[in-house]
């Protein structure tokens, strides 16, 4: 109070203004340099995911998959992980923020990998769900294709003026119509930047230069089956650019990437 009184004495007419909303608004739009750094982080992440897909096999411990991811990031040029990696096999794939990463992978299960490399203050945030044995079962493929359809529809709708809430509704409608609405237990995504869950809320219209994640999922604990697919998306003047499109995502592309 004493300090404020001195400020008022020396600067008549000054007032305290709430600027808490200014910084988030500024951070929600990235410069071209910032987007390049995020793209670099995504590219380094692609190396880690490629190594992990080759490494995943029955009997491998989740933490060894994490180690493979992080080794790939470092060898590609990354500076560690943007956040603690999630590597959840079987029932653990249905745990949204699973963090133990200490169980052996089991043949016939899926493993959900949610991770991203860190570079120059910025990080990637990617999720892929892959079959431990290298091939999706009929049921796994059925659920996976629904999540993929929802993700692709939401990505295609990204453009300036759209909100994350509207993108959520697009993906959620597809998953709900397929009979899995109650198993999509989180929102569609978030802003990405200096923090993994960067500032700016889900109802603010997206602007050119924003970078967001799109990450629908279906989690069936009674089947020990969880699927999440996540990409990092730049909002462009006329639509979007998928910064992580190089990371295998279709059933056939994942199975090919895992072939020994």
Question: Where does each model-flagged region fall?
Answer:
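Active-site neighborhoods and metal-handling regions in enzymes and metal-associated proteins
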Residues: 1-260
